[in-house]
From Swiss-Prot:
Encoding gene per record: lplA
Keywords associated with the record: ATP-binding, Cytoplasm, Ligase, Magnesium, Metal-binding, Nucleotide-binding
UniProt domain BPL/LPL catalytic: residue ranges: 30-226
Binding-site list for ATP: 72, 77, 80, 85, 132, 135, 145, 149, 163
Compartments, as annotated in UniProt: Cytoplasm
Protein name: Lipoate-protein ligase A subunit 1
InterPro entries: aa-tRNA-synth_II/BPL/LPL, BPL_LPL_catalytic, Octanoyltrans_LipM/LipL
Lineage: Archaea, Methanobacteriati, Thermoplasmatota, Thermoplasmata, Thermoplasmatales
Subunit details: Heterodimer composed of LplA and LplB.
Length: 262
């Protein structure tokens, strides 16, 4: 089977990037070619659909440090992004509404991709991938999370998207968390920092090398030949409309707007 590979990113505008993700998914029709998209975001925090920004992140800290706030179309928790993490999404036809099997299949593709790079990765929770930590050489024992994901589905189509930490600023990632009491900030930030890791903590690779491994891993796991393509006029038009009416508005990004406007 042939698929579409989209290298479509707007690093300086995370909100526009999310509009593209939703537009590509909503434009997809059952039987269309599967889509694999790669993109990055400059410093920003993306909250999940059901979250309220002021409850999840330190808005004052974000403002002082020039970090953009955005809210995505799917659920899940708040995620910090910068140019050191790699985002990717998959849209494909579906005959069922089983979201669990979707996450398992996508996680399998990611794990296979990371093993191409020489990483001993394995699925963590349903929506993330971790790397075992060597207790003899690492201070923190256990597992460290390097990727989280979210998804959506409707009749005939499924969307899955993920963010992988390649060489992200993990100190900044920890600092943007919302902490109820200021005196606990350092403790919670340290705890968060100890639970996550970059791919480059384990292997010396570039963003491009990780992307190429993911293309190969998804192609082999899903049995799809992804070929580079461009966004369609329909997808572009819907993305612009979604950005203007939803993703660019404070009501949406703060988590106060619940109804669909497009």
């Amino acid at each position: 089977m042939e698929g579409r590979l989209l290298l479509l990113e707007t690093p300086g505008n995370t909100r526009m990037s999310l509009a593209y993700d939703e537009a590509i998914y909503r434009s997809f029709q059952y039987g269309d070619k599967p889509i694999l998209r790669f993109y990055r975001h400059d410093r920003s925090v993306i909250i999940g659909y059901f979250q309220v920004a002021e409850e999840e992140v330190d808005l004052d800290y974000m403002k002082k440090n020039g970090i953009m706030l955005a809210r995505r179309y799917t659920g899940g928790g708040a995620v910090y992004h910068d140019l050191g993490d790699l985002n990717f999404s998959v849209v494909r036809s579906s005959d069922d509404m089983d979201i669990t099997s979707m996450f398992r299949t996508m996680n399998e593709a990611v794990v296979n991709s990371l093993r191409i790079l020489g990483l001993d990765a394995r699925p963590g929770e349903l929506n993330d991938v971790s790397i075992p930590v060597n207790k003899k050489t690492d201070i923190m024992a256990g597992e460290k999370k390097i990727m989280g994901a979210a998804g959506a589905m409707r009749k005939g189509a499924k969307l899955w998207h993920a963010a992988m930490l390649v060489h992200t600023d993990l100190d900044m990632l920890s600092a943007v968390l919302k902490v109820p009491d200021e005196k606990f900030r350092d403790k919670i930030a340290k705890s968060t920092r100890e639970r996550v890791a970059n791919v480059t903590d384990f292997v010396d690779v570039s963003i491009d090398e990780v992307r190429n491994a993911l293309i190969r891993g998804f192609s082999e796991t899903l049995h799809i030949d992804f070929r580079e393509d461009t966004i369609t006029e329909k997808e572009e038009s819907l993305a612009r409309e979604l950005f203007d009416k939803k993703y660019s508005t404070e009501e949406w990004n703060m988590g106060l707007l619940r109804k669909e406007v497009v």
